[in-house]
Structures are given as structure tokens and as C-alpha cells.
Amino acid sequence: MAFAFPDSFRFADSHEYANADGELVRVGISAFAVDQLGDIVFVDLPDVGASLAKGTSFGSVESVKAVEDMYAPIAGEVVQRNEAVLASPEELQNDPHGEGWLLVLRPSDPAELDSLMTAEAYGAKVNAG
């Protein structure tokens, strides 16, 4: 199965995405990662106000197959978390690049987005294998 990713998204090697929206950045996990996990039963996210360092764990996603940590693709402060996904983890599974987003961050350094893979590069990586 080939996956398509929104052109505006940037991706970390660990399958999290960052999508800039003005001064804020929406963070989630890719459709590829969701597909690999299978049926998602629980999502754990940090509280609003938490400060995240790039590459550090910010929560976990539990499926019937595994529990996987999620890592911050950029550094920043959590300004919003998706309560709908916490209440109904299947939202993440149904629309990971849309309604299934996880966090909104105020980035510490917006230039960090440039260090992430483009949608094209990420797509080539995950679809190759």
C-alpha cells in the first residue's frame, strides 16, 4: 500500500509530523505509523503548558499490537492538545493527518522545521520498503 502525505507537512525519522500554521505547529503521527500500529486503543499526551525538547518522548500510543513512544519533532511549548483523540483514540486512526492531530506547539525555534524531511522524502522512505 502506497501512502500519500500532505505537501505542507514535515516528518521526523520516528514518524511524527509537524505542520506549521502561522506561528504555531500542529503535531501528529503519520498515516504510515498508524497503519503499522493497527487498532489504537489508548493515547497519552502531555498537559498544556508542558515544554518539549526536540527528540524527547512526549507521550505514547497503545494499540492491540504494541505501545510506542512518540517523540517531539521540534522543541516548543504545548498550547493545545487534542482532547477528542484522548477520549476516542480511533479518531487518530481514522484521520491521522486531519482530525487525528495530537498537539499544537509554540515552537522554540521555527527553523527546526527545516531539519525535518519533506513529505516527498518521507513518502519515498516509507513507500520503498
Curated annotation (Swiss-Prot):
It comes from Synechococcus sp. (strain CC9605). SUPFAM superfamilies: Single hybrid motif (SSF51230). GO terms for cellular component: cytosol; glycine cleavage complex. CDD domains: GCS_H. The gene is gcvH. The glycine cleavage system catalyzes the degradation of glycine. The H protein shuttles the methylamine group of glycine from the P protein to the T protein. The glycine cleavage system is composed of four proteins: P, T, L and H. One of its GO terms (biological process) is glycine decarboxylation via glycine cleavage system. Keywords: Lipoyl. PROSITE patterns: BIOTINYL_LIPOYL, LIPOYL. Residues 24-106 form the Lipoyl-binding domain. The modification N6-lipoyllysine is found at K65. The keyword NADP does not apply. InterPro entries: 2-oxoA_DH_lipoyl-BS, Biotin_lipoyl, GCV_H, GCV_H/Fam206, GCV_H_sub, Single_hybrid_motif. It comes from the Bacteria. Its cofactor is (R)-lipoate. The keyword Transcription does not apply. This is Glycine cleavage system H protein. Belongs to the GcvH family. Transmembrane segments: none annotated. Binds 1 lipoyl cofactor covalently.
